């Protein structure tokens, strides 16, 4: 991953790097790799995440169509 440093402004470059890493999911990946996760636990976690995503999407659709109050 690469970030340009303009006018020796390291703080701005660090912010840009953190934003890029956040978007790419690097922090989440590092957190997940802290400890070994058994394949069965990984499958269960991924399935639960998928269910959560589907429910969230359905909730957003319903809200957009005016079926659910905000």
Swiss-Prot record:
Q: Any idea which UniProt keywords this protein has?
A: Ribonucleoprotein, Ribosomal protein
Matching Gene3D superfamilies, A to Z? Answer: Ribosomal protein S8
Write one Pfam family the protein is assigned to.
Ribosomal_S21
Task: Offer one example of a GO biological process linked to this entry.
Answer: translation
Q: Name one GO molecular function term.
A: structural constituent of ribosome
Q: Which HAMAP family match?
A: Ribosomal_bS21
Q: Which NCBIfam families match?
A: S21p
Q: What is this protein called?
A: Small ribosomal subunit protein bS21B
Species annotation: Rhizobium etli (strain ATCC 51251 / DSM 11541 / JCM 21823 / NBRC 15573 / CFN 42)
Q: The organism's lineage?
A: Bacteria, Pseudomonadati, Pseudomonadota, Alphaproteobacteria, Hyphomicrobiales
Name the gene that codes for it: rpsU2
């Amino acid at each position: 991953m690469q970030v340009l440093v303009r006018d020796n402004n390291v703080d701005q470059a660090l912010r840009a790097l953190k934003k890029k890493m956040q978007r790419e999911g690097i922090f989440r990946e590092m957190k997940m790799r802290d400890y070994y996760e058994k394949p069965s636990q990984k499958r269960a976690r991924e399935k639960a995440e998928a269910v959560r995503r589907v429910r969230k999407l359905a909730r957003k659709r319903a809200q957009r169509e005016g079926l659910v109050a905000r």
